[in-house]
Each structure stands twice: as structure tokens, then as C-alpha cells.
UniProtKB/Swiss-Prot annotation:
Superkingdom classification of source: Bacteria
An example Gene Ontology molecular-function term: ATP binding
Native source species: Actinobacillus pleuropneumoniae serotype 7 (strain AP76)
Keyword Nucleotide-binding among UniProt keywords: yes
Pathway: Cofactor biosynthesis; ubiquinone biosynthesis [regulation]
Protein kinase domain segment(s): 123-505
Residues that span the membrane, as ranges: 522-540
Gene: ubiB
Protein name: Probable protein kinase UbiB
Residues annotated as binding ATP: L129, A130, S131, A132, S133, I134, A135, Q136, V137, K156
Length: 544
């Protein structure tokens, strides 16, 4: 470890000690090195004893700087790991820092674009429109040299020298996380190293603005011509790893309820559309904006009777596969049907909990945690908290962490919070129910079978020529085996007809298994067709 890193580690540890964060260490025997380390810092005492632990942790992270602030923000969404009071304190962390010099921003942009800003833009504002720990944004207009002359744009630029700072602090986070499992069994359950790894990926992805560009383009295409959501246009010719240029939007922050009402916005429809946008992303597109907090969501001021969301900052997104979506849909439907056994089976069938899990105990654990939720009317039940309760129970049964579902649960909490802030009477279940039912019907109904046949048609055609040969070979093998069986039967006649029949059945079963094994790489319908043919032949021969 370098001297610089050692100094930073010392600063981190003493900051935590000054805020009394070491109280989370239980009264257990510490290692010799840990005891010596704490004694060496005997003079660093908790200077904020009058504050609750959650407040002290928030203040400590705030003091340590942007990388730790963003870690706290991420941890605030992991309500499967922390008490609600602690998560709520961490959610108060604000990723807002002083902007860096506008002239430096100009130099970075010009270096990325390969020329003077005046080549492409007019009215570049060196005063940042907004500033955060990773990047800041400036406004400008396309000049007469561009096809979109006069178009208002926003230029986002990564902070200079932020990457080495992030990587250095991440390395120290890994070192601290490696100590956590040694504290207690509860500390081991936090899987601190896994949390840091997840955070590292999220943070490093945010440093590459071309990812944000690609995500925004994909989301924009998914909602092209949609009345529900508008995503600003990206200008790929001007986008690089540390600089992107996008359309500037003008809207009302979704959290500014008074302005929305003053503008005549249909608040009920706006709240319902927020839920519809989320479930459309999840079940139709398998791709969702995973950072939908109030600062990233605006409402188009035009046509307030038909409100449209505007989404920005696509740096963090989530993707789902069919198994994820099936888990989500079936778990919600089973929960609202109070079918806790189905909920338990879903976790095992998905492979996220061990196959030898005690289903009865699993079901009972879900029942004990989820049943009290129904003391509320259905319209007041939070999907995000339902999912959180499912995660908490599943973790007790050794469920593997599913980062994509953690992202989804965080986003769902954002959507619910914004929806009920806009329209407190929002009925989430009635709004979401059609999406869940339609998706399940499409996956298991006649439509799903027809769609699967259509998708597999080229594969069917490719293997169809093999079908007659497969049947012929199976019949030839059966003919040869029958001859041998006849010889064997003569020998076994003295031992009774029943034994002969048993031998024929056993050998026929071996033939069937052999045929299935030989064609295990064929489509299901072709393998089944071959099997049915062989069974018919065997049946006819038995009758003869």
C-alpha cells in the first residue's frame, strides 16, 4: 500500500471513529491486530454521541466525499440488508458538489471533440447548469454549421482526474469489506465484498458516458412515439467516453406537485402512467431505467390533460431475462392470492435457493412475514416492500443475491413513492394487475405455444429430413431386438410366460431410452414424434 493510500485509509478509519461507527462491532474477542489498532487510536472518540447511529453514519459518509456519498445512496436502496431507519438516513445523502472550473470543462470538451467549441456551438455557458460527484452539465446551442441550427443542447462532461480517485477509494473499500465477515455471523450475512463489487461496477459504468448514450438511445427507441414517456435525443457524433451531447429538455420536476397542479395536470393519470411506464419497461422490453429518482424525472408542461414523463440520465439501467420476469410476475400474483407455497416453490425452481430447501418451512416463513401486510387495503400495499419482504425471507434460506432484482426493487420503490406523492390514492395493484396477467397469459397460453412454434420453425425445417431416417433406424433396431427376444423367449419358456413379458418390457424400455438419448439434441416435437412411433410399433407387436 502506498503512503498516499495509507494516509487515506487512516483518514477513513478516524472519521468513522469520530462518528462512533465502531459501535456496530459487537462485543466479541477481536484479533490481536484489531485490538492493537484500536488502542493505537485511543484518543479518537465518538464526538456525536447525542445523534442516532443512522445520522452519524450519514454525516461520516458526507465528510468522506463523493465516492462514499454515492456508496451510501446505493446502500439506502438495499433495504434487504439494513433497518428502515438506517436506509432512510442514507437516502438523505445528496450527490451535489461544487462544480469544477468552466474553463477546464471547455478544455475537456474541446479535446474530446477535436476542435474549438465555436466550430459546432454557440452560447456555451461556462457556468454549470448542474453538478454532481462524477460529472457536470453545461448548456449550448448548435450553430449555423450544424443541421440542427439553433437547437438547445446539454453537454455532460466527466470531472477531471476523478477515475484514479474512485479506483483508490474502491481499493480501500475492498480492504475494509474483507474485515467485515470476521466480526460476527450477522456481519458475514452482509456480504460486504459483494456489495462493494456491485458498487464498483455501477460507478465505473457511470464513468463511461458512451454507455449512458447507448442506454438512452435504446430507451428512446423503446418508447418512440409514446404518449407516456419521452427520452431526449442523443447526438452520437458528439459523444465520447468523457463527453456526451444531448437534446435539452424543458419540463416540470415530478416532485414539484404544486407547479404540476397549477399547470392543470391530470394527477391521477400521471401517477398511473408512472406505474405503466415501469411495468412496460420490465415486461415488454426487459430493460429499465434504474435511477428514476425525482431529480431524473420531469413532466412535459404541454398537454397537461394527457401528461407525458421525460426521463434523463440513463447511466444506470437494469436488464431482466425470462426467468427474472417469471419470478416477478408469479411471485406478485401468488402473493396477492396468498399462495405462499407457490412463492416458496418459485424461489427454488428459479435456482436462487438450494434445491434441498425445506419447502414447508420456507412457506411458513413467507406466511409469517407477508400475511400481516393484508391488514391494509390492497390499494395501499407497496409492491416494493412486498418484494423486499420476499428478499428478506429468502436470504434466511440462503438465497443468492440477484443484483438485477435489487435494482428493480429500488426502482419500484422510487416509482411508488413518486406516484403516491403525485396522487396519494394511487391503486398500484389495479394499475399493475393487467401487465402481470397479460404477461403470464402470453407465457403459458395458446399464444405462447404458437409463438414458440413460429420461432422454432427454421430449426424444425432443418431437422425434418432426419425424422423418417430416425423412425426407420428405430424400427430396424426393434426388428433385430425382436429376433433376439424370440430366441431368448424359447429359452425362458420353462420359467414362465410372465418373465418373458418382463424381459421384453425391460429391453423395449432400453430401446426407447436409447432413441431418446440419440436424438436429445433434436427439437422436442421431433424427439416426441420418434418416441410415439416406437411405442405404437411396440404396442402393435405385443398384440400380434
Amino acid at each position: 500500500m502506498t503512503c498516499k493510500n495509507t494516509r487515506r485509509l487512516y483518514q477513513i478509519i478516524t472519521t468513522f471513529l469520530r462518528y462512533g461507527i465502531d459501535e456496530i462491532i459487537p462485543d466479541i474477542p477481536l484479533t490481536r491486530h484489531a485490538r492493537l489498532g484500536r488502542k493505537a487510536l485511543f484518543w479518537v472518540r465518538n464526538q456525536h454521541k447525542d445523534q442516532p447511529f443512522g445520522v452519524r453514519l450519514r454525516l461520516a459518509l458526507q465528510e468522506l466525499g463523493p465516492v462514499w456519498i454515492k456508496l451510501g445512496q446505493m446502500l439506502s436502496t438495499r433495504r434487504d440488508l439494513f433497518e428502515p431507519e438506517l436506509a432512510e438516513q442514507l437516502a438523505l445523502l445528496q450527490d451535489s458538489v461544487e462544480p469544477f472550473d468552466g474553463k477546464s470543462a471547455r478544455q475537456i470538451i474541446e479535446q474530446a471533440l477535436g476542435g474549438s467549441l465555436e466550430t459546432w456551438f454557440d452560447e456555451f455557458d461556462e457556468q454549470a447548469l448542474a453538478s454532481a460527484s462524477i460529472a457536470q452539465v453545461h448548456t449550448a446551442k448548435f450553430n449555423q454549421n450544424q443541421p440542427l441550427v439553433g437547437k438547445d443542447v446539454v453537454i455532460k462532461v466527466i470531472r477531471p482526474d476523478i477515475e484514479p480517485i474512485i479506483k483508490a477509494d474502491i481499493a480501500l473499500m475492498y480492504r475494509l469489506a474483507s474485515w467485515v465477515p470476521r466480526l460476527s455471523n450477522d456481519a458475514r450475512r452482509l456480504r460486504a465484498t459483494e456489495v462493494v463489487r456491485e458498487y464498483e461496477k455501477t460507478l465505473l459504468d457511470e464513468l463511461d458516458l458512451t454507455r449512458e448514450m447507448a442506454n438512452a438511445i435504446r430507451l428512446r427507441n423503446n418508447f418512440e412515439n409514446s404518449e407516456m414517456l419521452y427520452v431526449p435525443e442523443m447526438y452520437p457524433d458528439f459523444c465520447h467516453k468523457n463527453v456526451i451531447v444531448m437534446e435539452r429538455i424543458y419540463g416540470i420536476l415530478v416532485s414539484d406537485v404544486e407547479t404540476l397542479k397549477a399547470n392543470g395536470t391530470d394527477m391521477k393519470l400521471l401517477a398511473e402512467r408512472g406505474v405503466q411506464v415501469f411495468f412496460t419497461q420490465v415486461f415488454r422490453d426487459s430493460f429499465f431505467h434504474a435511477d428514476m429518482h425525482a431529480g431524473n424525472i420531469f413532466v412535459n408542461p404541454n398537454h397537461p390533460e394527457n401528461p407525458q414523463y421525460i426521463g434523463i440520465d440513463c447511466g444506470i439501467v437494469g436488464t431482466l431475462n425470462q426467468n427474472d420476469k417469471r419470478y416477478l410476475a408469479e411471485s406478485f400474483v401468488a402473493f396477492f392470492n396468498r399462495d405462499y407455497r407457490r412463492v416458496a416453490l418459485m424461489h427454488v425452481e428459479s435456482g436462487w435457493t438450494p434445491a434441498d430447501t425445506d419447502i414447508d418451512a420456507f412457506e411458513q416463513a413467507f406466511r409469517e412475514v407477508c400475511e400481516p401486510i393484508f391488514a391494509k387495503p390492497l390499494s395501499e400495499i407497496s409492491f416494493g416492500h412486498v418484494l423486499l419482504n420476499l428478499f428478506n425471507v429468502a436470504r434466511e434460506f440462503n438465497m443468492e443475491v440477484q443484483p438485477q432484482l435489487v435494482l428493480l426493487q429500488k426502482t419500484l420503490l422510487y416509482i411508488e413513492g413518486l406516484g403516491r406523492q403525485v396522487y396519494p390514492q394511487l391503486d398500484l395493484w389495479q394499475t399493475a394487475k393487467p401487465f402481470l396477467q397479460n404477461w403470464l397469459n402470453e407465457q403459458v397460453g395458446v399464444k405462447a405455444i404458437l409463438r414458440d412454434l413460429k420461432q422454432r420453425a427454421p430449426q424444425f425445417r432443418e431437422h425434418f429430413a432426419e425424422f423418417p431416417e430416425a423412425v426407420f433406424n428405430a424400427l430396424q433396431q426393434q426388428k433385430q431386438i425382436n429376433f433376439r427376444l424370440d430366441e431368448l423367449n424359447k429359452t425362458l419358456q420353462a420359467q414362465g410366460r410372465q418373465k418373458s413379458h418382463n424381459v421384453r418390457s425391460i429391453v423395449s424400455g432400453v430401446i426407447i431410452l436409447g432413441v431418446l438419448w440419440r436424438f436429445d439434441d433434436l427439437p422436442l416435437w421431433l424427439s416426441c414424434g420418434t418416441l410415439v412411433t416406437v411405442l405404437l410399433v411396440l404396442l402393435l407387436q405385443r398384440k400380434s
